[in-house]
Amino acid sequence: MASKILVNIKEEVTCPICLELLTEPLSLDCGHSFCQACITANHKESRERSCPLCRVSYHSENLRPNRHLANIAERLREVMLSPEEGQKVDRCARHGEKLLLFCQQHGNVICWLCERSEEHRGHRTSLVEEVAQKYREKLQAALEMMRQKEQDAEMLEADVREEQASWKIQIENDKTSTLAEFKQLRDILDCEESNELQKLEKEEENLLKRLVQSENDMVLQTQSIRVLIADLERRLQGSVMELLQGVEGVIKRIKNVTLQKPETFLNEKRRVFQAPDLKGMLQVFKELKEVQCYWAHVTLIPNHPSCTVISEDKREVRYQEQIHHHPSMEVKYFYGILGSPSITSGKHYWEVDVSNKSAWILGVCVSLKCIGNFPGIENYQPQNGYWVIGLRNADNYSAFQDAVPETENYQPKNRNRFTGLQNADNCSAFQNAFPGIQSYQPKKSHLFTGLQNLSNYNAFQNKVQYNYIDFQDDSLSTPSAPLIVPLFMTICPKRVGVFLDYEACTVSFFNVTSNGYLIYKFSNCQFSYPVFPYFSPMTCELPMTLCSPSS
């Protein structure tokens, strides 16, 4: 009986962590007690201040030393170390006999009197020495299994910690990205605000200048009328001779007096400011960031016309006027050079600084042949291997598209309405476009219908946004000239981004100065051969410079 009591007491003063008698016990708010060393080590490992048994949180300042449990544990140690008590442990608490048998049904050690009692009668029993090895092996296997489970639990714990760290890093990255995007948005807004204020200041300057001039004109007009009034008053108050002297001239002057009204400025004609589309601006900025991920290291190929100069690092080209001109160099389109490397696949992006230049052409070209053969303006077409945009006369931005077939010039805009026959078998209905035979158009009273290629009946409508013009001389017109597509810029680009997607067959141009807005995009490009970056400084001596990502 005494042994059973000791066992119960021992359970009460045993640390749940180390399973030994409590040493310097500390009690938590929940009532559980642990060794001071055990609870401290547990906190360092788990990094959580919670009870290992019930998981109730606690504060370290609330840990209380439990002297009562410490005294009980100390007394129990003394009893367990006593030789007499050690002998009692091996004896039956009920009968006082040695515990020599093991009951298979109850799984307990019993004495020979217990075996004969009603409680264990008919149960299968064995000597403790016989079953000890068997259960030792079972417990050893169980120990190995639990150690493996401990390792698995530690791995799961490590996985949770790793996932926690991963999420923390990901969220921190998202925070950084969000801050960067909003900073970029604020920079965009600051830039837009500055541009709008500059426009308003310029408008104010021009408007006030004109109003001041108008005020001066009105002052002069009032002064001239006052002079005339003073002359009339003097004549009326003077003698007859003074009244009649030159009176016809005075009357004529009076008849010629007409009040000039001041120049007026209608408020409704003023440009109304509209807040920028923030969502659209962010989308544009996102698209620019996406293509900038494909930044290519482009350099200029030294094989170039003598009228151009390339820097030593092969990243800058400029026009240099020559004293002795080659006859073919009189045409001002051929100062272009190619970039390296050649492109046969993938996505590639580069940026070109064109600050303060009054003329330039850039984009993509299919072959080096154009450099040696000095091509004409007609070559600036996708069908000839050029996908380019350019600037001329400081403010005319254009994209170069394929020339429209001549039959497309027969369009109804010229008031000529009739049916015509062309090349014996092509009859077509024509609508307005361009001069020459093209003048058979509605705007010139020519409208007609007919058959084309024996089976195709077509109506041709106007393409008012396009013109066949020479890049340097708008007065010239040629059927083979490229179709010039005007490009309208709210902010003139100082830096132009070029994005080539070889597999998608597209070439896109971005106004980096205007936060990455798309300038123009060529689609369905036929890249049959390797393509090269293309640059032409034209006759402007300011350089074109390839930019680096860091700039």
UniProtKB/Swiss-Prot annotation:
Residues 182-195 are annotated as: Required for interaction with GABARAP and for autophagy. SMART domains: BBOX (SM00336), RING (SM00184), SPRY (SM00449). GO terms for cellular component: nucleus; P-body. A zinc finger (B box-type) spans 87-128. Residues 276-551 form the B30.2/SPRY domain. InterPro entries: B30.2/SPRY (IPR001870), B30.2/SPRY_sf (IPR043136), ConA-like_dom_sf (IPR013320), SPRY_dom (IPR003877), TRIM/RBCC (IPR050143), Znf-RING_euk (IPR027370), Znf_B-box (IPR000315), Znf_RING (IPR001841). A zinc finger (RING-type) spans 15-55. CDD domains: Bbox2_TRIM5-like, RING-HC_TRIM5-like_C-IV. The modification Phosphoserine is found at S82. Transmembrane segments: none annotated. This is Tripartite motif-containing protein 5. It comes from Alouatta sara. The gene is TRIM5.
